């Protein structure tokens, strides 16, 4: 019976300071040789997936926390908020003092006139690492799949959540400076369910690796969830853990699950 193995990207499969570890690449190659379906399951949209991750020989991708799903080159989902409502959303972000970049499956967009200190390093990193995909708001096509914000005033996050609630769910990362705003009705979990149905995988043969709170829907959906050794503490209290990305966590976890030797 075919198996489905899903990997979060940031902090699980990839970090800027260590890229994708060689041990993880070899482990994934072994999984594919064993006939398993291997997929990315990331909060990132396609425009900001690192090239080294894109080059992995995976079956497909769940991106943007479930707003984009592709299997063997076939796009199953490419969801976005469109039209005039996008301008209302932008007004709320400005009013709540939340510098942002808007994501969809094609590009990401930010306001070059609104880059306070809390947002400056992110903008520099994005422009350096993904120059072909960074666009200014003058080019924004009123199509939002996901928003990442760097709030100037975190005391207003409850207000932000309430005002965006008709269209979005908000994931607050206490350990990071940014928060993620996800199109309502979508998550990594909804993407996983869609892939399970499309590939006709037995749910008991599903596995997921993650490290942060946006991975929770994926970890709850698969039969076998495992978190990295340096994962968010609340996840480590709920799911078994492997070692960190710096200590061959993917390879060790796959061995612990009996998927590779």
Regions found by a protein language model. Give the residues of each.
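Asp-based phosphoryl-transfer active-site loop
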Residues: 3-17, 219
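Residue-level signal for inorganic ion chemistry
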Residues: 31, 42, 147, 192, ...
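Active-site phosphate-binding/coordination module
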Residues: 17-117
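Short active-site oxyanion
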Residues: 35-39, 58, 145-147, 204-205, ...
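Conserved acidic, metal-coordinating active-site core of Asp-based
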Residues: 92, 96-209, 213-218, 230
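Phosphate- and divalent-cation-binding pockets in alpha/beta enzyme and binding domains
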Residues: 23, 47-51, 159, 191, ...
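Asp-based, Mg2+/Mn2+-dependent phosphohydrolase catalytic module
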Residues: 221, 225, 229-261
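Short, well-ordered beta-strand core segments
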Residues: 5, 61, 99, 225, ...
């Amino acid at each position: 019976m075919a198996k489905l193995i899903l990997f979060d990207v940031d902090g699980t499969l990839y970090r800027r300071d260590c890229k994708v570890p060689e041990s993880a690449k070899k482990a994934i190659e072994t999984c594919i040789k064993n006939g398993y379906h291997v997929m990315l399951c990331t909060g990132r949209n396609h425009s900001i997936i690192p090239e080294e991750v894109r080059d992995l020989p995976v079956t497909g991708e769940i991106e943007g926390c479930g707003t984009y799903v592709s299997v063997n080159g076939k796009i199953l989902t490419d969801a976005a908020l469109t039209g005039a409502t996008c301008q209302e959303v932008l007004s709320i972000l400005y009013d709540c003092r939340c510098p942002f970049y808007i994501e969809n499956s094609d590009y990401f967009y930010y306001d070059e006139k609104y880059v306070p200190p809390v947002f400056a390093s992110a903008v520099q990193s994005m422009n350096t690492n993904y120059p072909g995909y960074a666009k200014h708001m003058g080019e924004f096509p009123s199509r939002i799949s996901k928003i990442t914000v760097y709030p100037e005033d975190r005391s207003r996050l409850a207000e932000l959540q309430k005002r965006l609630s008709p269209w979005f769910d908000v994931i607050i990362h206490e350990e990071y400076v940014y928060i993620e705003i996800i199109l309502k009705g979508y998550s990594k979990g909804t993407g996983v369910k869609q892939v399970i149905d499309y590939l006709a995988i037995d749910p008991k043969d599903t596995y997921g690796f993650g490290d942060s709170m946006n991975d929770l829907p994926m970890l709850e959906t698969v039969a076998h969830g495992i978190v990295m050794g340096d994962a968010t503490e609340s996840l480590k209290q709920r799911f078994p853990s492997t070692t960190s990305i710096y200590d061959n966590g993917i390879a060790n976890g796959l061995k612990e699950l009996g998927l590779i030797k």
